[in-house]
Amino acid sequence: MDIKQYKEQAKLIRDNETYKVYDLLTLKDLNLSLTELNPGKETAGHSHKEADEVYVFIDGKGRIEVGEERIAVKESDVVAIPGGKFHKVFNEGESILSFWSIFEKYEGRDK
């Protein structure tokens, strides 16, 4: 997959005033997705009971909360999220905050 052409190759699974989410690569047990979070918006936040997750920030700036920790993020930052930790992303910039998510596949992902 040519990562620069992801939108032509990806499956758009969410599109609303807050963000767009694309599934880029789905393996038997692993997903790679892209979130484009609009300025001034935040994700709903969630946790995965036992699965770890990795976020790779590719554009924009903002903040991620992982449990009680608040971390400023920008392009090229990587954040590891341990299983069971609630996490939420905030776009504090004036442009779209884009990040890759790498996580274990789960039932109902595309709903």
Predicted regions: what is each one?
Residues 42-44, 63, 79, 83-89:
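Histidine-centered metal-chelating micro-motifs
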